[in-house]
Amino acid sequence: MLFFRASTDGTATDATAALENLYAGNDPTACWLVGSGPSILGAPVEQIAASPVVKIGVNFSGRGPDGTAPRITPDIWTSFDPTSRFHRSIFLNPRITKFLKADKQKDLIPGTTFKACDCPATYFFRSETRGYGDFLDSRSDRILNALDSFIQALDIGYRLGFRRFFCVGADFIIRPSDAQVSLAVSCGIDFDETSGVLVTKDADPKLHYRSDRLVDFVDECIRKFGGKDRRAVIEELESAGREQQYSFSETKPLAAAIHADSHYWERVQYLRLARRNLSLRGVSLVSCSPGSRLNDWFSFREPLTVCDEMTAACGDPREERTVGRYSGDVRDAVRESLPHHRDVSPYDWAQTVSRRAKSDLDSAPT
């Protein structure tokens, strides 16, 4: 039982048959996988929201600053994080299909007396850890657990039938602020906007290297800030001016941001090491997030170009005409392609159906 509905009495109703490969079609089905990195603030969100494909969201993806409407409202949503972190406008919205871990089915929804299993369009799943060789596995009855909402969403999307994932707002990096960089440079730290800080922890200059990891930036500051301890350096960096961590109104303490950035870096390595598995499963992961760590290992596409291609593939209602659809001969709409359509049965199909029917009859209980 991969996906199921749940009740407050603990009973479960299998929904796998209705959901697995629901979105698969004659061509590899595309979707937007929406994150909450700062890059989404510069993305063409109106065109993305209007594009004719499903938007899969994680956590607070698509949210802007407090007091503003969501920039993108997801069609499908999931999160690895605690239920209490998120708003009821996600859980109680029947337009958003939610996928939650099985242990969250009786969590209370913030601001309500409802449990997660009471919410509309909400499904649950059990999870498991897997290696890179079976990173995505259609034979499993569980979703991949990598302690990460993005990877969880990727596996859910795969089981729903999506094969092309266009990732927007998926930065997978927390960069130091301009003020923090200026402070570091004034203390003799070598920082490059593209490749990050020059790490000099080894005395041999030949072993120095560039790193875009926030932990390396802070550690280098500790080495160069005149003998100050780690706590004092972090406080000084925080007071200089905070880094932009998300597209929405929230900023973690710098110590927590360091941990989050290391998590992002590691999960990108997971995806890099799983590329052959993704290829074998027919999955294409495409970054549409400028400056994302994904861009080192996966192809990058401009989101507007992707929007245009999606619209061209699905059809543009703005260019379609309804005149004549009731008053004319609608067969004209397909007549040109009819000469190329000749449906045929599979080889020896009548005998195959007969054999299957006999086999089912023979195996039926008496």
Could you describe each region identified by the protein language model?
Residues M1-T366:
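Metal-ion/cofactor- or nucleotide/acyl-coenzyme-handling active-site neighborhoods
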